[in-house]
Amino acid sequence: MRLCDRDIEAWLDNGKLGIDPRPPVERINGATVDVRLGNQFRTFRGHTAAFIDLSGPKAEVSAALDRVMSDEIVLPEGDAFFLHPGELALAVTLESVTLPDDLVGWLDGRSSLARLGLMVHVTAHRIDPGWQGRIVLEFYNSGKLPLALRPGMLIGALSFEPLSGPAARPYNSRQDAKYKGQQGAVASRIDKD
């Protein structure tokens, strides 16, 4: 059962759930908390590798990822990031989220943005128990026009679901947690699997 708005506020008030900066009550609706777009992005460099063999030797996968991913792009205030049709880009939420060991989170895109062709997450919308950091967004423009994305705009909504008990291996305690404490648009670390 997902938390309702009153429960989300109570979990924020008692410190079990952390969202920084804390959203105003107007952004906590029904069963979700609206989140905004941060100012950090990564893109894919065009045709710098013929392919990436995801099951190949780790060193080769790592080298291929280094060739295809841009350095982090940090937008100055007021600037827009343009996502063209058919392009994939990574970004982060403005908010940093901290989940306790007995709560899982879910990120959903906004319907208004989806109706323009913007996918906010390609597949990875679960936020593990014990997570701490900003949430990476996997943008894809499936529409016909470029989309101007500006830091601070509403970009998605988080919902939260209590677990039957605390997780035995929460994200923040795992040695193999590849994205622990991420604050920027961290590229894929599939080579660490």
Swiss-Prot record:
One Pfam family named in its UniProt record: DCD
Pathway field: Pyrimidine metabolism; dUMP biosynthesis; dUMP from dCTP (dUTP route): step 1/2
Enzyme class (EC, first level): hydrolase
UniProt GO molecular function: dCTP deaminase activity; nucleotide binding
Keyword Hydrolase: yes
Alphabetized InterPro entries for the sequence: dCTP_deaminase, dUTPase-like_sf, dUTPase_trimeric
Record note on quaternary structure: Homotrimer.
Protein name: dCTP deaminase
Organism: Erwinia tasmaniensis (strain DSM 17950 / CFBP 7177 / CIP 109463 / NCPPB 4357 / Et1/99)
Gene name in the database record: dcd
